[in-house]
Each structure stands twice: as structure tokens, then as C-alpha cells.
Amino acid sequence: MTDSPDRLIATDLRNEMSQSYLEYAMSVIVGRALPDARDGLKPVHRRILYAMYELGLTPDRPFRKCARVVGEVLGKYHPHGDTAVYDALVRMAQDFSMREPLIDGHGNFGSVDNDPPAAMRYTESRLRPLSTNSLLRDIEAETVDFIDNFDGSQQEPTVLPARIPQLLINGSSGIAVGMATNIPPHNLGEVIDGAIALIRNPEITEQELMQIIPGPDFPTGAQILGRSGIREAYLTGRGSITMRGVASIETMEHPGRPDRDAIIVTELPYQTNKAALIERIADLVNDKKIDGIADIRDESDRDGMRIVIELKRDAYARVVLNNLYKQTPIQSNFGANLLALVNGTPEVLTIKKFLTVFWEFRIETITRRTRYELRKAEERDHLLQGLLIALDNLDAVIRLIRGAADTASAKTELVEGFSLSEVQADAILQMQLRRLTALEADKITAEHDELQTKIADFQDILARRERVNAIIEEELEQIKAIHATPRRTVIVQEDGELIDTDLIANDQALILLTEQGYIKRMPASTFGTQNRATRGKAAAKIKDDDGVEHFLSCCDHDKVLFFSDRGVVYSLNAYQIPIASRTARGVPIVQMLPIPKDEKITSLVSVSEFDDDTYFIMLTKQGYIKKTALSAFSNIRANGLIAISLVEGDQLRWVRLAKAEDSVIIGSQKGMAIHFKADQDELRALGRATRGVKSMRLRSGDALISMDILPSQVVANIAVGSEDEPDEDLGGDTDAILEESDNPGPWLLGVTMKGFGKRVPIGQFRLQHRAGLGVKAIRFKSKDDQLVALHVVNADDELMIVTNRGIIIRQSVNDISPQSRSATGVRVQRLDADDAIAAVALVPPSGEEELAEMSESEES
């Protein structure tokens, strides 16, 4: 058979290839790969949801076989492969793929190990409440356009009347021709709050929206490192977001064998294959690319994920974990590309543009829904008006109908005789006799009045944009109240990332570090001021073999410096330390700082500014003291910095901040104290890698316990003594309370292990030269008591006292009686029989108090 010449079209091959490929590309972009910015769905997902809705698979109905759904979609709306449709259905049911799943699956729908789902003939599904409430509701109310399906036998919606910004909530990914999209999922409650904020303030900026929507919220939880990638994605539509799994370091106890550290992974980054990750780690260990791993096993169960990476005895857990972050998908990047269809055209969207497109779409759908409801109400009211006319002229209507030859003539006479429309005349002719009763007439009148009110309301909505916006807000709030869930993904500060501290309140905080190395941060407001000699509140869940070792009061914007017994200093921002409740144990400090097992934190210091006029005074266990400029510690590396050079057997124990004009007071267990200046003559400044000089001479069996700094303003009024002068007897009643009017302060506060304490006027501690014995600071009530803390305090100070069992009491310094050096003190905290005072810390003044003091000084 030969082709007719009329059927052959001569064309240039290059033009034909170009045109055909362009048509194919646009078909893929619009009809397959990219989601619509309005409802956040690709055509296949939209067709699945609509087909399930048409099948009646609502949340209150039984499950149906997925094969039935797939067949419905293929036969009516989506003439492609059944595997593609089933895969799309499965993904919408996976809680590890969708932040808010749209389909409720029954059966095996796959796993994070990339296990395939069961065949569609075995699995069942139905719609979730979120789908019916927020995507498919009002679809019959002419809210969206419908078009013919592929063969013209059915109608399908071009978009679903979404009540939420579904594209932001569940995200999307797809590869088209020449372009791709990769939109991360977000928290439903946060996105709704952002949409409401935009409606209330259309001029809101992307930066302000980021305060409401801080970042993606992945279904698998995990962490996001830093905000720079989020900021770039939200402002430009493209950005790289670093995700990191949640891992902790635990000690594994093996009966009969030494304990070992293990890395426990409980959450993985979004779209990470758990089985492939474990295989990857095993390959790296076998290839000697990661050292220190002895065993790896998957202990995940129905209660959650748990990957156990057991380490060798000599392995440093933090180093191994950092290698895992670097070489495995435990840390990976999400390449955000916020591309979606807007009016059928691919467009890269910012966070504000996303919400604006949704807002405009909601205005359109509510306007169309209101017009539909108005039309239906007017049509119904039109019928009721005809019925009311008939009831008002009941006898005449009955006579007319009885006298009419047939229905058509009765209809014509009704239209002409009572000025009715044909629709009204039909309604009268179809009216049942029972509706002629007085009760039915009252019902018709009441319905007419109600419809008149509704019609006026619908007309008001169409006339006023603010009414439409109020309805959008109300519907968003309703969905949030029902479907919002807490955020799963935690956004943490990335190492070296600069953040705006204006976004973090500079609140007072307490930092607690236990002997076993657990650290936590608590708001100072957790502990209200209590009376002296009360028991206090539990501040930590302390195990029997653990106790509180360090206790620091600071502000959240401060840098917290951790000094170890080896003379190394580490640094953290106070707000980086996880905040915890009073009774929480905290987190292992090895998760936050690269501290070797045989190294111990011995001192915590908070710093607000690193300047040249301030110094660190460091004191070692053997009594060596050193002064080094604070500016030398302004750039502390991640793995720490040498703070002092130590001889074998010595340890760095105490570190304080001081000015060159200040003085130093050092106390010992047996109640002795030495007071000397910190100036260049007595204690010259040294570099970091130096040892220091001798501070205090100790008697046999005594040891240093504390050091504090006395401000220069007070030092000028203190007498200077010599080492040869005897420790004078102050005479009189040694436990007598001193008059505060005669001793305005500051005082030296001493607290003993047994819970006794007192305030001693600083003037009773004469200035001496270093390396002396010092003078008596306190007399003990019992021989087994000893001094545990010495602090310089003022009358308006507050202090926190913590015990070995984690009990904390907060009290005012004024509640502790001022006494002489030779007094035994008063009870400052009631202790249990097996408890003892562990540490004492002063509470810094709040920001409000500081501002008040500044304003008073300016006024004076």
C-alpha cells in the first residue's frame, strides 16, 4: 500500500526535533514532574486522592485493596504504568517520607531500610482525616475547575481546593527536563502560623517569616546544622541544608568485661536508608578508613530506631563520631530547590512567595465557594417564595389547579395568574398535601427568613476582602487545632556559624556539671529565693555513684570556659548547653566537648567580653598560681587550648577573673585564708604556657579548697600585714553577730561541708605577701567538718548552694549572719545524713537590674 502524497508533510528535521522535544519537555514539566504551588500535588497524586474520594474511601469507611484504587486511577484518570501509580500511593502513606501522610495504609508499606512494600493485591488503604479536611473538602462546591480526562469519559479537577499550604508541609521532589525540584517538608503548625502572619501583615519580610517558620521539619526528625542554608533557601529559593542524625555516647556495661563506650544513633537524616548506612559503616571499618569501631548492630524495633556502634576500649568516642559525620550519611545535605508551577509556569519561589500563592488561591476558592452557596441559597429561596405565594393564596391556587385541563395548562395559569416563574410553578404543582398544614407553612417561612440572612452574609463576604481573609484564618486555625504536631527536627548552631544573639534572650542561667560528666543548663528563675536553713529543691537526678561537682551562675549570652585538670581550656556558648528541667540528669559533656576519658573539668568560668585589662587567675592543686590576660583566650580551638603548664602530679583546680588592681583570697580545708594583691609586684602576668608561682604555704594534712577575687575599690581600705604578725585573737564572743551598720561589706562568705556558713568583714583579712600561711577564717563545730567554699559577697547578692545529692537552695546573702573570723557560723542548709555541701555559686544580677543601675548612675 502506497502512501498518498497528500498525507506527507515536508519539514526540516532540525525544526521538527526542536519542536517535538519542546512539547515533550513541557508535557513532563506540567503533567508529571513538578507540583502545583496551590495544592502542592503532582497530577498522579491528585488523581489518586480524587479517585479514592470518589470511591468513598474516607476515614470513617473501611479500607479497600490498593489494587482497586490503582485500577480506578488507571482506568479513569492516569493511563500510565500501574507500578508508578502504586509507588506514588505508597509514598503518601509512609510516615517516614511524608511529614503529614495523606493516605492511611494497612499492611506492609515499606520501611526506612528501603524494604519494598507488599504487592498491591495484599495492601489496603483509605484517606486520612487531613486529606478530607484540608484537601478535598468543598470540591463539589465549584471551588476549582474540572477538565475532561484522557478519553473524555470523566471529569477530573485541575487542582484540589487545599485549605493548607500542602507543598510546604509535605514537600516534593521531581526531575523534569532541564529542571528539578526538591522542596523540604515543614511543620504544619508553623506553616499555618506563617500563613496567618502574612494575611495579617502583607508587608511582612522573609526574615520575619523565618522567626515563625524557623526551618524544615523532617518526618524522621534528626537535626539541622546552622541556619545559613535555610536562610539562603528561603530568601532565594535555592540552598543547601545540612542534616545530621541524632547520636549520643553511652557506656556499655558487659558483665565480666571492661566497660566500653558506644555511639547510639536514634534518628537519621531525611531519606537516609538505614540498612545502606550500616553497610557503609561496615565497609569503612573493613577498609581501615574509620578506626576504633569494634561492632555495629541494628537494635531498632517498634518503639523506635537504635543503631549501636560499639567502640574499642582505646577509641576516642568523639573522634569516631566526627569521622562518621564526615564519611557517612549520618550527616548529609538537603539541596533545596523550591521550584513549583505557578499558573502553569515553572517558578523558583521564596518562602513568602509560597505563602502568597497559597493565600491568593484560598481567596479564589472561598470566593467561588461563596458564589456557589449564594446561588444555591437564592435558588432555594426563589422556590420558597413561590410556595409562600401559593400558601397566601391557597384557595385560589387549589381552584386553579382543579379547574385546569392538564399539568401544562395548570403551570401556565399559575405563571400568568400569580407572576411566578416556571420553576416556582413546578414546585407548587409538586408540593405534597401535607405541606398545606399550618406547621409546614411556618417551617417554610422560617427557612425563607434563614436563607435571607445567609444570602445577605454571602453577599457581604463577596463585597469585603477582610471577610474572606477572616474565613481563611478561621479555617487555618481549625485545621491547626486538629492536626498540628510538635516539631521533630531540632535546629542547632553549626560550629563556627555566627548567629544573631538578639534572637536569644540573655536570661540568667545555672550550669550544673556532675562528677560523672553530665551537664545541663537551667533558668535561674527555676529556683526562687528560700529562707536560710531550709532543705532546698532537687536540681538534678543524681545516681548513687554520681554527685554535683561544678556549679556556675551566668547569662545565656556568656561564653562558658571549661578548664581541665590537665591545664587545657575548652569553650561553649552558654545557650549551646542543652536546657533541662530541675530533675533531669543532663547530657554527657563528651557529646559537647572533645574531652579525653582521663581528663576532668575542674573549673567553669563565664566570660562576656575578652579584653586586655582583665586576667585569668589560675590556681593548681599544689598551690601554684598564675595570672594571664583574658585576651589570650579569645580564640579557643574546637579541641581546646593550653591554659597553664603543669609539672607531673599537679592539676589545675581553680580559675577566676580579676583586674590587675584586685586582690586574691585563697582558702584551705582547715579554715585558713591568705589575702594578697594581684598587681605586677606580687603576681606578674605570664603567658599561657607557663607554670606560675607559689601561692600559699600549707600545714600538714591541709589542702586548698577555694579562691576568689576582691575588687580594687575595697583593697585600698584594707590594712597591710606581714607574715611575722601573729593571727590575732579577735576576742569577745566568737559566735556573736556583728552589726551590719559597722561592717557595710563586702564580706568573705565561708561555707562548710556540714552546711554551716557565715559572712566575715573583708577588713579582718589583712593583706600579706604570697606564699604565707595566712590567717584563720573559720572555726568548726565538729572535727570532721571542713571548709568547701570561700566567696567575696555583697549585701544584695544571692547565692546558690548545691549538695552532693543535687539539692539546690537559693538564698540571699543578707540571710546569713555576719560574724568574726573565729566564729563557727550559722546553719545555711539543712542536710540529709548522707549528704554534704558540694559547691556554692553567686547569682549574677539580671539585665533589668543592670539597666536600672546604669540609668541611676546617668541621672546622678
Curated annotation (Swiss-Prot):
One family name in Pfam for this protein: DNA_gyraseA_C
Active-site annotation: Y122 (o-(5'-phospho-dna)-tyrosine intermediate)
Domain Topo IIA-type catalytic: 34-503
Subcellular location: Cytoplasm
A cellular-component GO term for this protein: cytoplasm
Enzyme Commission identifier(s): 5.6.2.2
UniProt short sequence motif GyrA-box, positions renumbered to this chain: 530-536
Domain of life: Bacteria
Keyword annotations of the record: ATP-binding, Cytoplasm, DNA-binding, Isomerase, Nucleotide-binding, Topoisomerase
An example Gene Ontology molecular-function term: ATP binding
Catalytic activity line of the entry: ATP-dependent breakage, passage and rejoining of double-stranded DNA
Similarity comment: family membership: Belongs to the type II topoisomerase GyrA/ParC subunit family.
Classification via PANTHER family: DNA GYRASE SUBUNIT A, CHLOROPLASTIC_MITOCHONDRIAL, DNA GYRASE/TOPOISOMERASE SUBUNIT A
Quaternary structure, from the entry: Heterotetramer, composed of two GyrA and two GyrB chains. In the heterotetramer, GyrA contains the active site tyrosine that forms a transient covalent intermediate with DNA, while GyrB binds cofactors and catalyzes ATP hydrolysis.
Function: A type II topoisomerase that negatively supercoils closed circular double-stranded (ds) DNA in an ATP-dependent manner to modulate DNA topology and maintain chromosomes in an underwound state. Negative supercoiling favors strand separation, and DNA replication, transcription, recombination and repair, all of which involve strand separation. Also able to catalyze the interconversion of other topological isomers of dsDNA rings, including catenanes and knotted rings. Type II topoisomerases break and join 2 DNA strands simultaneously in an ATP-dependent manner.
Note: Few gyrases are as efficient as E.coli at forming negative supercoils. Not all organisms have 2 type II topoisomerases; in organisms with a single type II topoisomerase this enzyme also has to decatenate newly replicated chromosomes.
Name assigned to this protein: DNA gyrase subunit A
Protein species of origin: Synechocystis sp. (strain ATCC 27184 / PCC 6803 / Kazusa)
